[in-house]
Curated annotation (Swiss-Prot):
This is Small ribosomal subunit protein uS15. Belongs to the universal ribosomal protein uS15 family. It comes from the Bacteria. InterPro entries: Ribosomal_uS15, Ribosomal_uS15_bac-type, uS15_NS1_RNA-bd_sf. SMART domains: Ribosomal_S15. GO terms for molecular function: rRNA binding; structural constituent of ribosome. One of its GO terms (cellular component) is cytosolic small ribosomal subunit.
Amino acid sequence: MYLDAAKKQEIFEKYGKSNTDTGSAEAQIALFSYRISHLTEHLKLNRKDYSTERALTTLVGKRRALLNYLKNRDIERYRAIVKALGLRK
């Protein structure tokens, strides 16, 4: 599987406030970004997989909502996570 418990733990350790921090906006945004990149690669090979395309659109929307929340709450944390993940904004 592309996202096992060890990979999730690695993401949470890198972007969360602690190694058990799964709820912070940064940790969730990083997890969504990993899943989005995986689904994007899947869709390059399977162009007619519409259920995956819908799931990808949903994930992008969730990540966008979290980014907007973080931007409104703490602009410095927002800029840091965008830079760390290499997002366009």
